[in-house]
Each structure stands twice: as C-alpha cells, then as structure tokens.
C-alpha cells in the first residue's frame, strides 16, 4: 500500500504536466513552419536568351505601415524562386539577355476602427503588392522588349487575432498572390514576348 500511495501522486503529476501543452498556447518554436511557394512542377518558359538575370530593386523599410518583414514567407524571396522555376535561358549562342526585375514586394497594414466601444471589433487590413518586369535586351542591336505585371492582394482580419492565426492567413495570402501572378505573367510573356519564347504552347485546332 505504501508503494501505491507513492505512485498515485506521481501519476497525477505526470497527467497534469502532459496536459499543460494543450491548456497553454504554443510557443514560437512550436508554431508551424511555412515555405515560399514553388512552381518547379510546371514546364518552364524557355527563352531564346543566353542568360537570365534576377534583379531586386525592392528595399524593405522595416517600419510601419510596411510589415512584409513580419510575414513567415518573403514575397521578395518568393519572386526570386518563381523566376528560377519558370524562366529559363535556352539559347546559349544568343547575344540576348533576359532580366527579371522585382520592383515591389511589400506589404502594408492599416487599422480599421470598429464602431463598437464595448467590444473590440477593430480590424487590420493588409495589402500585398508584387510588381515584376521581364525585359529582354539584344546586345547586337541594343533593342529591348519587356512586359510587366502589377499584382496585389488584400486581407482583413480582427485586430486581436493571435500570431499563429495571423501567420496562417499571411501564408495563404502570399500563395494566392503568386498563383494569380503566375497566370498573369505567363500570359503576358506569351503575348508580348512571344518572338523570344522557344516552347510556345500549342493551341489545338478543331475541325
């Protein structure tokens, strides 16, 4: 009986400790880890250029209302990865060079005050911007051709949303932004830079 009395408090204590992980919120180390969206499962667009340079002209300020540095995934890094996945040089004897220029990859926030003084129904509105230009330069005659896409996405959530939920919303926001951008930029390349595309999509002909 003495042994049983000694074991019982230990068992109760063990149950209490194991239950703490569900009673208390997750620490930052236990938050889900997110990664930038990738498009390497799609067939890349092959250009008749000998090189593709990826250039970022975006400079984060790290001060509000700019909050892109708080996101679990970087829009700027995602843009660079998109260019690596989707745009390929395919004519190494050519004197033409392609540039993927990231002009904007920022996020701003705006507090929207609620009209209820008793309950906090303030909201935070986020706007993610992505502006990319693809430019092809022919070094033989210094001619240029380019196409540009300005994509944006907005999200409004309650101001008291916890960090784990915020990161989940932010990650979804970035993924949707790039899914839309990927479609728009692919269309623009086929329309405006078509003469430089080697693997043009085949349009079926029906009789």
Each predicted region: which residue ranges?
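Short, well-ordered alpha-helical segments
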Residues: 74-89, 169-193
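Short secondary-structure boundary motifs at beta->alpha junctions and helix caps
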Residues: 68-69, 143-184
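Surface-exposed short loop/turn segments
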Residues: 94-146
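N-terminal segment of the mature soluble domain
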Residues: 43-106
């Amino acid at each position: 009986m003495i042994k049983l009395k000694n074991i019982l408090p230990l068992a109760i204590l063990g149950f209490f400790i194991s239950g703490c992980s569900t009673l208390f919120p997750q620490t930052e180390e236990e938050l889900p880890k997110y990664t930038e969206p990738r498009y390497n499962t799609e067939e890349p667009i092959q250009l008749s250029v000998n090189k593709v340079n990826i250039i970022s002209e975006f400079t984060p300020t790290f001060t509000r209302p700019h909050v892109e540095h708080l996101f679990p995934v970087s829009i700027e890094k995602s843009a660079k990865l998109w260019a690596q996945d989707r745009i390929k040089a395919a004519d190494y004897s050519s004197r033409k060079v392609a540039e993927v220029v990231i002009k904007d990859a920022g996020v701003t926030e705006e507090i929207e005050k609620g009209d209820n003084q008793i309950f906090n129904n303030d909201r935070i509105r986020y706007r993610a911007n992505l502006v990319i230009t693809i430019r092809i330069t022919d070094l033989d005659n210094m001619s240029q051709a380019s196409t540009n896409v300005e994509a944006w996405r907005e999200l409004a959530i309650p101001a008291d949303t916890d960090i784990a939920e915020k990161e989940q919303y932010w990650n979804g926001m970035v993924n949707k932004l790039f899914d839309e951008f990927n479609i728009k930029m692919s269309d623009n390349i086929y329309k405006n830079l078509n003469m430089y595309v080697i693997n043009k999509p085949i349009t079926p002909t029906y009789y």
